[in-house]
Amino acid sequence: MEGKFIQRIVREAEELLSRDFAVYAKGSEGDLVTDADYLVERFLIEKIQAEYPDFAIISEEFNPDAAISENCFIIDPIDGTKNFANGLPLWGIQVACRKNGETIASVISMPALKEFYFANESGAYLNGEKISVREVPVLNAFYAVIGGDVIEAATRMQKYG
């Protein structure tokens, strides 16, 4: 039930992002926030509070320091705000739901790439198709990017494979 709910509200939130938004400096140097962050966050919070009033909400702009509770929704309204603000496609809306202390469903929507990821106890899906990790026959064939600048990492990956 919660999985279908977060899929629906994230799809609805995507529709809010079809116009230009103002960009502001936030907190530390280089940290940005846009009107889109606030718009999507308010929209998602209102939907969650109406449907799940007893669940806590943790969100990057609204309540970032709240402790994760047994029953809560965790929101990043625009993950990749710098990319979003600069017109780059690597950004997304993220929502996860915890119930009875377990993360039971999550969504990552990347509208600019037309990618919609959903995961729950039955697996992970991209645009409705089940996905899984690729088998790595030997450790030296394994490639991982951890932390850092996603754009720089993607550029290196394209250049060097």
Sequence positions of predicted segments:
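Short loop/turn microsegments at loop-to-beta-strand junctions
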Residues: S69-F73, I93, I104
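Acidic beta-strand-loop-alpha-helix segment within the catalytic core
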Residues: A96-G161
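N-terminal subdomain of lithium-sensitive/metallo-dependent phosphomonoesterases centered on the IMPase/IPPase/PAP
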Residues: M1-I78
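Catalytic core of PPM/PP2C metal-dependent serine/threonine phosphatase domains
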Residues: G87-W91
